[in-house]
């Protein structure tokens, strides 16, 4: 599996939405994190599971990460897409769906397998896969819509009430 890039980020916290209220949970704000982005070389849930297992072993051996997903030390947010034969011949990819907030390798494997089947079903029924963020419902063993990546209101963007100018 080829690695496209590795970069450092800082966790900013997370938004919690309950009814008509939104809250910001800053418990993880400022926590450094390393993001590893791979090329589209993984073609199945089993390949993803094997890659993550080797990656975690490498990170642990290097002493840079404990690899404990259940403690939030390692996260995986797979981008999954299915393409038609015509798209493959043109060198194109299908529309990607990102699955967020997975807390175990088993959840990664299960969510990828489910999402692949879901997308194939959509395409075979004549529909189009939408670019969205999905979550994983462990109890129902299925992905669930979190938000569309196309609607600004889904990102809770608001107008600032005051702004300062820098000179």
For the regions a language model picked out, list residue spans one by one.
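Basic, nucleic-acid-interacting segments
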Residues: 1-163
């Amino acid at each position: 599996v080829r690695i496209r890039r590795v970069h450092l980020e800082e966790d900013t916290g997370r938004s919690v939405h309950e009814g008509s209220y939104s809250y910001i949970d800053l418990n993880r704000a400022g926590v450094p994190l390393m993001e590893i982005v791979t090329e589209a070389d993984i073609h199945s849930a089993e390949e993803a599971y094997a890659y993550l297992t080797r990656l975690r072993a490498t990170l642990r051996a290097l002493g840079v990460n404990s690899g404990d997903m259940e403690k939030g030390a390692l996260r995986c947010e797979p981008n999954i897409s299915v393409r038609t034969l015509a798209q493959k011949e043109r060198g194109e990819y299908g529309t990607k769906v990102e699955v967020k907030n997975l807390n175990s390798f088993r959840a990664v494997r299960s969510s990828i397998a489910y999402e692949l089947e879901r997308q194939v079903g959509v395409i075979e029924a004549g529909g189009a896969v939408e670019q969205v963020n999905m979550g994983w419902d462990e109890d129902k063993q299925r992905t669930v819509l979190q938000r569309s990546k196309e609607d600004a209101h889904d990102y809770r963007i608001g107008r600032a009430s005051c702004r300062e100018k820098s000179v």
